[in-house]
Amino acid sequence: MAEGVVLFGVHKLWELLNRESARLNGIGEQVDGLKRQLGRLQSLLKDADAKKHESERVRNFLEDVRDIVYDAEDIIESFLLNEFRAKEKGIKKHARRLACFLVDRRKFDSDIKGITKKISEVIGGMKSLGIQEIIDGASSMSLQERQREQKEIRQTFANSSESDLVGVEQSVEALAGHLVENDNIQVVSISGMGGIGKTTLARQVFHHDMVQRHFDGFAWVFVSQQFAQKHVWQRIWQELQPQNGDISHMDEHILQGKLFKLLETGRYLVVLDDVWKEEDWDRIKAVFPRKRGWKMLLTSRNEGVGIHADPKSFGFKTRILTPEESWKLCEKIVFHRRDETGTLSEVRVDEDMEAMGKEMVTCCGGLPLAVKVLGGLLATKHTVPEWKRVYDNIGPHLAGRSSLDDNLNSIYRVLSLSYEDLPMCLKHCFLYLAHFPEYYEIHVKRLFNYLAAEGIITSSDDGTTIQDKGEDYLEELARRNMITIDKNYMFLRKKHCQMHDMMREVCLSKAKEENFLEIFKVSTATSAINARSLSKSSRLSVHGGNALQSLGQTINKKVRSLLYFAFEDEFCILESTTPCFRSLPLLRVLDLSRVKFEGGKLPSSIGDLIHLRFLSLHRAWISHLPSSLRNLKLLLYLNLGFNGMVHVPNVLKEMQELRYLQLPMSMHDKTKLELSDLVNLESLMNFSTKYASVMDLLHMTKLRELSLFITDGSSDTLSSSLGQLRSLEVLHLYDRQEPRVAYHGGEIVLNCIHLKELELAIHMPRFPDQYLFHPHLSHIYLWCCSMEEDPIPILERLLHLKSVILTFGAFVGRRMVCSKGGFPQLCFLKLEELEELEEWIVEEGSMPLLRALTICNCRKLKLPGGINYITSLKELTIVGMKWKEKLVPGGEDYYKVQNIPNVQFINCDE
């Protein structure tokens, strides 16, 4: 049995005591006593976790342990913070300082004795219930050692939902044919129960070569149970017209008219994924003309939704997999491994494993989701005894299933087993996903910072960062088919992850079972939280409404995190006198993105939250920050990405534990920030030389990501400052000087020896020679550079480039040439608003791995020859160019694009 959530908390407390042992010197006797009791407690918790489903008293004991651990953390942290603040204030009178010191020590000594006594009582109670000590060496292992061990034993195996399809090939062809060839229908619908593969099937149809060639544009929108009509319309518009920028503030009626007109004028395919009710279609349909070139692919659990949308629609009902198909799918996942080069190889199937596997897949009820999750679980087991343990856990569900409810119970048992098998760090990571609303695209960087703030993931002495560790965790959950990760080949890092709704139900159930999280779905802006329901949960997630205001009605010291998720186009309003912050004094994580503060002032009581590690005010309505922010000494993450002008006091320098800092884009003119003491920063966003000295960067030697605005004459010191940032991997540099200064880009990047992603918006007549760049540079984004010489001969010799974007006057010359053998790794290329470009030559053998090409508003550019040489090209997007007639079937240049599966024309008819 993998370790439980409570045991993880005990490990964290153990780590805290070890890490701060030097600062706790002088009261070591009490601390040592606490550590001894923690050691005894750890040896009991494995057995207790295994028996928690059998006994309510055991569950109560585990809850007591969780509360004791939290209390101990708070006591230790508060003591250390008080000591630090006393030293910082520099109390002049020695006697007064000594008196304060002795009082604090006596209180701390007494508090630790109380904690130790409580643990002793819990241990006695557990033993009276027959809980056994399990001493296997694991309990004494540090978190870093456990994480290292987990990483070492990890195996890779085939896990592509697209390649793991079984038994649907003919269905894909039929559905694609109806979308393209049947002019009598507007809607094709796919129906079936949750987890049966509707979305996977729809995705295969969506990417079918025939479909991609037929339509001019494509949109894919998830429709949740509680969707906003305007949000669905916005997503459709953004996907069909991606070049038209932000439309979040567009009036709903104007948006409806624009979308209606757009769908009248071209052949577009819109996918509405997971429409629940017929009434949902009625709310969305106003933007769709009665009969034009648009078609819709719709998925739903309700067969009647498609018929309601279009009585002539073609309806396809998905079927469950046969036992043979289920085993074939499971076998693909378990026994087809990838080596280090990515090559698939088959592993010999043990007869006993095969026999057990064929029985176990019957519990999946023919649902592909459950089969894939079971496969992901079994792929981590490599011996017959390990398989036997999984088999025994599923055993009670292998027989006697005679109803739909029995089948669902067995399916959920399989999904739950995947959770129970996780190592304790991954359990926390998985449970944290329960915070997010249904169908929410979870931004992985944001998730990693939540996890870091709670100590679920930590950086390591070997240079492994929080982001590295977080990506390892998500990859493992994806390998187990518990989540899906959206990997954008344009960029280095993963962008978003999601859960299937059935897996999310398991996540929510486990979070409730562990008292991990309380979710408040507030249906209206005036709805409030019932304070009584806060009694058990250590984490709160508020979905919409104005409920934050009512949190001040009670004090709940158990709450460690509070995340607010606004409805579309909605802001929660917090009064300036809100007692909310004082009511939740032990918060570690506070996300108030898109909260509107009365009078534009963040209450000074924010400074009372001295335990905060994470504070996000992204897109919040704030014009004034209080100086009490200086009290937040433990902050790791601070996001001040506000709307509008803001007053920022010079107190950020005191947050010396910060790893991530996003500054406001616009601050008062007199603002001068001193940031040189922030030596632990790994990400610094929106740094401007208008508000801080570029010399401060010299001290931030751990920076891996930097976005920098130059607004004054500090360009001469820029190169020397950046040269000290030897860990820098991502650099975004923008010149806002008037008049613009010409740069030699090579001086800027010469010493950035680990640079992988570079964005330059600076005046740079000539692109630097390739030898000035780090050889593993992967992504370049150049705009407003006014380069007079063709940069391609240099760029194409950067052998590891995966994406290149040249936009908004990056190049002002007339001719570009991509030569044979150039860009050997390039996957994505975008040419946009290059107004002087007339000729682009693509030689045969150039860009052999290019997957996506976008050409946008290069008005003088002639249709490039040589595109047909790029045989790897899968997506060609052409925006605002007069080439459509030549490139559609029957056009004189159609041969150049006929082998590209997806060719889109946007605004090409004018």
UniProtKB/Swiss-Prot annotation:
Sorted keywords for this record are: ATP-binding, Coiled coil, Leucine-rich repeat, Nucleotide-binding, Plant defense, Repeat
Coiled coil (residue ranges): 22-60
Q: Please indicate if the UniProt record lists Nucleotide-binding as a keyword.
A: yes
InterPro entries, A to Z: Apaf_helical (IPR042197), Disease_R_plants (IPR044974), LRR_dom_sf (IPR032675), LRR_R13L4/SHOC2-like (IPR055414), NB-ARC (IPR002182), P-loop_NTPase (IPR027417), RX-like_CC (IPR038005), Rx_N (IPR041118)
Q: What superkingdom does the record give?
A: Eukaryota
Q: Name one GO molecular function term.
A: ATP binding
The record's section on CDD domains has: RX-CC_like
The NB-ARC domain extends over 169-461
According to its UniProt entry, the protein's GO biological process terms are: defense response; response to other organism
User: Could you tell me which residues the LRR repeats occupy?
Assistant: 584-609, 610-632, 634-655
Please give the family membership noted in the entry: Belongs to the disease resistance NB-LRR family. RPP8/HRT subfamily.
* Protein's name in the database: Inactive disease susceptibility protein LOV1
What lineage is on file? Eukaryota, Viridiplantae, Streptophyta, Embryophyta, Tracheophyta
Q: Which gene encodes it?
A: LOV1
